[in-house]
């Protein structure tokens, strides 16, 4: 009986712990999931591929901030799937940008 009470106490404590913060410091500019990588890209081809992409130089907090940070380098704010070697496949315009 005591075992079940203690086990229930530990289970309740485990459930009450907050979830791990998995944010990347970039606010809600990109949707969670596939398109979760904020990138400042020089060019967007066919609305799908970002060329000469870089991670924003500072944390961004909303779409307007993301647009302004990317505009400093003449780039477009995009949310991409797989940024590799300065190229990003499957990009979409950032939320609110």
Swiss-Prot record:
| CDD domains reported in the protein's UniProt record | hydrophobin_II
Q: Which InterPro entries does the entry link to?
A: Cerato-ulmin_hydrophobin (IPR010636), Hydrophobin_sf (IPR036686)
Signal peptide as annotated in the record: 1-16
UniProt key word S-adenosyl-L-methionine: no
Q: Which residues form the propeptide?
A: 17-22
Result of knocking out the encoding gene:
Leads to wettable and fluffy colonies. Results in thinner hyphae and impairs the formation of aerial hyphae.
Disulfides per UniProt: 30-79, 40-70, 41-53, 80-91
Please name one Pfam family that this protein belongs to: Hydrophobin_2
Q: Keywords in alphabetical order, please.
A: Cell wall, Disulfide bond, Secreted, Signal
Give GO cellular component annotations, separated by semicolons: extracellular region
Query: Is this entry keyworded Disulfide bond?
Result: yes
Q: Where in the cell is it found?
A: Secreted, Cell wall; Secreted
Q: Which PANTHER family match?
A: HYDROPHOBIN
Q: Which family does it belong to?
A: Belongs to the cerato-ulmin hydrophobin family.
The record describes the protein's role as: Aerial growth, conidiation, and dispersal of filamentous fungi in the environment rely upon a capability of their secreting small amphipathic proteins called hydrophobins (HPBs) with low sequence identity. Class I can self-assemble into an outermost layer of rodlet bundles on aerial cell surfaces, conferring cellular hydrophobicity that supports fungal growth, development and dispersal; whereas Class II form highly ordered films at water-air interfaces through intermolecular interactions but contribute nothing to the rodlet structure.
Q: How does it assemble?
A: Homotetramer. Further self-assembles to form highly ordered films at water-air interfaces through intermolecular interactions.
* Record's protein name: Class II hydrophobin 1
- What gene name is given for the protein in this entry? hfb1
């Amino acid at each position: 009986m005591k075992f079940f009470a203690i086990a229930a106490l530990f289970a309740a404590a485990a459930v009450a712990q907050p979830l791990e913060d998995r944010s990347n410091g970039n606010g809600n500019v990109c949707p969670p999931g596939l398109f979760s990588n904020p990138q400042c890209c020089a060019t967007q081809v066919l609305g799908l591929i970002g060329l000469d992409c870089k991670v924003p130089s500072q944390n961004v907090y909303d779409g307007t901030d993301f647009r302004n940070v990317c505009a400093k380098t003449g780039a477009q704010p995009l949310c991409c799937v797989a940024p590799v070697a300065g190229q990003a496949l499957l990009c979409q315009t950032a939320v609110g940008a």
